[in-house]
């Protein structure tokens, strides 16, 4: 049995002259039904609510205003789920809708609840359809066509494989639409190779922002948790069927042989640091070399404002990020305490090692 997360991009659900949106979704549902009959489990992370909403509302152009996009998404999401429900029902399966925002993952309890809900639905043989809650998410919460969301879902439920279905056949060394020198990349074998590829995606083109760049981020999040990732051309009906039967996508990102684990992945990727804590050299060495917790005595300076139990970055005197974790004290409390000589003795723990992840453990 293989647990799959399948991310279907917006561009794939718009429909073409040859294939309507309904036919496209029917094809995907057919592939999934065949795979489920073999004993596999699946979660779909589906974009497309805004686009379908615009079609339902008769808009000629996609709105630019965030409120218009949210309203269009609320219309489109209903239609999107109707299609998935209709076609999976023809194969004898039920579907469930899961709408998520970034704030849902920032709470460890909500993160666990989402994971348990998804696992229970899978146990019942239901196909969960996950989407970002576009109707209420604001600009700071948008995941980027659900690429990052699909990786976070994959790590939350310990998926075996993540398939990123998109409108390109594979990863290239540069944008093949603008360069004749673009070379296909069929395998990304290790974190250093992935890091090198990410560093080359710099220019603000469709290839570099919100397109392939977010897919590379998703691949990094998933592979460092031990999940195999396929980047594949979802425009071809046979692509998904072949992958679910054991073939490979156009580009395969191979999983880390030393996964960081669910909790560390959550700390590193599901949370947005609210501030930063600058630590001294002794604390740097203790945390990096000995796996120690951060004590109050090792703090030099506080950057930004945060409350107790919020995520923060740990940085050295040069501003380089060393780790991320959950601070047990607020920035105000820390600011009042770090210069108090009485705290040098029996120094309290500010970030326990159980809620701290080293940057060196990640592919960043």
Swiss-Prot record:
Q: Which SMART domains does this entry report, sorted A to Z? A: PUA (SM00359)
Keywords for this protein: Amino-acid biosynthesis, ATP-binding, Cytoplasm, Kinase, Nucleotide-binding, Proline biosynthesis, Transferase
Superkingdom in the source lineage: Bacteria
Residues involved in ATP binding: 7, 166-167, 209-215
Q: Give the residues the record marks as binding substrate.
A: 47, 134, 146
Where is it found, in Gene Ontology cellular component terms? cytosol
Where is this protein localized, as stated in its record? Cytoplasm
Question: NCBIfam families, per this entry?
Answer: proB
Query: What function does the entry list?
Result: Catalyzes the transfer of a phosphate group to glutamate to form L-glutamate 5-phosphate.
Q: What is this protein called?
A: Glutamate 5-kinase
Q: Which organism is it from?
A: Prochlorococcus marinus (strain MIT 9211)
The gene name on file is: proB
């Amino acid at each position: 049995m293989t647990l799959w997360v399948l991310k279907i991009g917006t561009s794939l659900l718009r429909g073409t002259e040859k294939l309507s949106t309904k036919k496209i979704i029917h094809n995907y549902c057919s592939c999934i039904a065949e795979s489920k009959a073999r004993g596999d489990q699946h979660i779909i992370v589906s974009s497309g609510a805004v686009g379908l909403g615009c079609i339902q509302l008769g808009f000629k152009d996609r709105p630019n205003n965030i409120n218009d996009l949210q309203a269009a998404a609320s219309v489109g999401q209903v239609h999107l789920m109707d299609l998935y429900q209709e076609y999976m029902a023809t194969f004898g399966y039920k579907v469930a809708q899961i709408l998520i925002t970034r704030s849902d993952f920032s709470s460890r309890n909500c993160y666990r609840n989402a994971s348990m809900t998804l696992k229970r639905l899978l146990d019942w043989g239901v196909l969960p359809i996950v989407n970002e809650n576009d109707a209420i998410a604001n600009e700071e919460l948008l995941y980027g066509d659900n690429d990052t969301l699909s990786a976070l879902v994959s790590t939350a439920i310990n998926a075996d494989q993540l398939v990123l279905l998109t409108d390109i056949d594979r990863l290239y060394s540069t944008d093949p639409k603008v360069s004749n020198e673009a070379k296909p990349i069929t395998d990304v074998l290790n974190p250093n190779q992935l890091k090198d590829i990410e560093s080359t995606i710099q220019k603000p083109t469709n290839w570099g922002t919100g397109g392939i760049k977010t897919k590379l981020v998703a691949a990094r999040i998933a592979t460092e948790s031990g999940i195999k990732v396929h980047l594949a051309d979802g425009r071809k009906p046979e692509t998904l069927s072949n992958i679910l039967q054991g073939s490979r996508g156009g580009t395969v990102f191979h999983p880390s042989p030393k996964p960081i684990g669910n909790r560390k992945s959550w700390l590193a990727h599901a949370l947005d640091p609210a501030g930063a804590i600058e630590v001294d050299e002794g604390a740097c060495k203790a945390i990096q070399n000995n796996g120690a917790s951060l004590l109050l005595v090792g703090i030099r300076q506080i950057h930004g404002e945060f409350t107790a139990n919020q995520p923060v970055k740990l940085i050295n005197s040069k501003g380089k990020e060393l780790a991320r974790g959950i601070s047990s004290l607020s920035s105000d409390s820390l600011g009042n305490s770090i210069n108090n000589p009485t705290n040098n003795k029996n120094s309290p723990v500010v970030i326990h090692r159980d809620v701290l992840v080293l940057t060196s453990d990640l592919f960043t």
